[in-house]
């Protein structure tokens, strides 16, 4: 008999959502509000993990209704982390137990920072200390092309990509983004409400660009500037693309 079924261990790209509300009706409204701040379709169909450390007195029925809340937002809840449930309860709910890993403070130069993104961290403003100055920022340098389907997030600092960011790829940074190549995918700078952040690329062909949650869909809104582009956010929340 031929062996046509092979099990392999592989890290999948999962997004983490910190759940701090037990009332699912309130949670539904909160999720609606947060998704409205993200570019249209940014999380549609995304696999999600619920972080449940802050929630207590919940049971299997609550878990099943939680899955429904995600489904109504076109999100797929596949697992939970930091939760009180046993393996039998998770099996009946159709969820997996996802080990909780503390975010790493730094990565070796050239490595990708993370493959999972916290929804709250990504689209909600953060504490004021982030804006205290660039001296405390770290820089994540990626020395290769970013392929379609990849997502790279520079947590707590700037992102430099030495290569092309292909269509379908997403790059995110708490600070600035520099692409020393062609930017074809989606770029989100200053995602913790840093309005002073900027995006620079040698060639602009992006799908979406965003600074501090303000974004432009460049597939729908044509622009003429193509080379050596610096993108900044104006005080009236419009974007300025300047050739250097």
From Swiss-Prot:
The keyword RNA-binding does not apply. The keyword Cell division applies. InterPro entries: CAP/MinC_C, MinC, MinC_C_sf, MinC_N, Septum_form_inhib_MinC_C. Keywords: Cell cycle, Cell division, Septation. It holds the Pfam family MinC_N. GO terms for biological process: cell morphogenesis; division septum assembly; regulation of cell division; regulation of cell septum assembly. Coiled coil: none annotated. It comes from the Bacteria. Belongs to the MinC family. NCBIfam families: minC (TIGR01222). Cell division inhibitor that blocks the formation of polar Z ring septums. Rapidly oscillates between the poles of the cell to destabilize FtsZ filaments that have formed before they mature into polar Z rings. Prevents FtsZ polymerization. Interacts with MinD and FtsZ. This is Probable septum site-determining protein MinC. It comes from Dichelobacter nodosus (strain VCS1703A).
């Amino acid at each position: 008999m031929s062996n046509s079924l092979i099990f392999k261990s592989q890290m999948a790209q999962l997004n983490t959502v910190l759940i701090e509300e037990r009332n699912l009706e309130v949670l539904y409204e909160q999720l609606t509000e947060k998704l409205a701040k993200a570019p249209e379709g940014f999380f549609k169909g995304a696999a999600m993990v619920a972080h449940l450390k802050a929630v207590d007195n919940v049971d299997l029925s609550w878990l099943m209704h939680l899955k429904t809340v995600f489904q109504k937002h076109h999100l797929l809840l596949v697992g939970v982390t930091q939760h009180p449930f046993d393996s039998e309860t998770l099996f009946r709910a159709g969820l997996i137990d996802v080990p909780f890993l503390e975010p790493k403070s730094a990565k070796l130069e050239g490595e990708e920072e993370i493959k999972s993104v916290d929804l709250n961290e990504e689209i909600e403003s953060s504490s004021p200390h982030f804006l205290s100055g660039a001296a405390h920022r770290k820089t994540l340098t990626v020395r290769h092309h970013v392929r379609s389907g990849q997502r790279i997030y520079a947590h707590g600092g700037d992102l430099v990509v030495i290569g092309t960011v292909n269509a379908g790829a997403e790059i995110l940074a708490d600070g600035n983004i520099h692409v020393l190549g062609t930017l074809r995918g989606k770029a989100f700078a200053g995602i913790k409400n840093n309005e002073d952040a900027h995006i620079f690329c040698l060639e602009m062909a992006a799908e979406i660009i965003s600074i501090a949650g303000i974004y432009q869909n460049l597939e729908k809104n044509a622009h003429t500037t193509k080379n050596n582009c610096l993108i900044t956010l104006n005080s009236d929340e419009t974007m300025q693309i300047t050739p250097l």
